[in-house]
Amino acid sequence: MADLTKLVDELSALTVLEAAELSKLLEEKWGVSAAAPVAVAAAPAAGAAAAPAEEQTEFTVVLAKAGDKKINVIKEIRGITGLGLKEAKDLVEGAPKTVKEGVNKDEAEKIKKLLEDNGASVEVK
C-alpha cells in the first residue's frame, strides 16, 4: 500500500508536459490510444440524434403570453394543472412558462385550444 501512495505522490509532482509524455509512453507500451474511447462514445450520440426523427409521442404545453383575458386564462390554468389561485396567477404572469409536460398529442391540442379560446398564446413542443 505504501508503494501505491508513493507512486501517487510522484505522479502528482509531474508537470503537465511530463504527464503528457508519460501518457504517450504508456500508450505505446500497452498498445492503446487515449483517443479511442472518445470515438466510441460519439457513435451512440449520433444514433440518439436520429431517434427524434420518429414521431413525437409526448408534448409540452407552454403558455407564451396570457393575452387580454388574464383572469379567464388563470381559471383555465387552475383547471388544467390543479394549481391554487396564487400559483396559477404566478404562472400566467410569469409567461412564458410550462403549463403541462409529457402529455399526448390530443391532450396537448385540447389544452392549447382551451387557452387560446381565452386569449392566450400557447406553444406545443
Swiss-Prot record:
Molecular function per GO: mRNA binding; structural constituent of ribosome
Pfam entry (one): Ribosomal_L12_N
Q: Which UniProt keywords apply?
A: Ribonucleoprotein, Ribosomal protein
Gene Ontology biological process terms from the UniProt entry: translation
Recorded superkingdom: Bacteria
A cellular component term from Gene Ontology for this protein is:
cytosolic large ribosomal subunit
What InterPro entries does this protein map onto?
Answer: Ribosomal_bL12, Ribosomal_bL12_C, Ribosomal_bL12_C/ClpS-like, Ribosomal_bL12_oligo, Ribosomal_bL12_oligo_N_sf
- Give the family, as the similarity comment puts it: Belongs to the bacterial ribosomal protein bL12 family.
What does this protein's UniProt record list under function?
Forms part of the ribosomal stalk which helps the ribosome interact with GTP-bound translation factors. Is thus essential for accurate translation.
What assembly does the database describe for this protein?
A: Homodimer. Part of the ribosomal stalk of the 50S ribosomal subunit. Forms a multimeric L10(L12)X complex, where L10 forms an elongated spine to which 2 to 4 L12 dimers bind in a sequential fashion. Binds GTP-bound translation factors.
User: What is the protein's name according to its record?
Assistant: Large ribosomal subunit protein bL12
What gene makes this protein? Answer: rplL
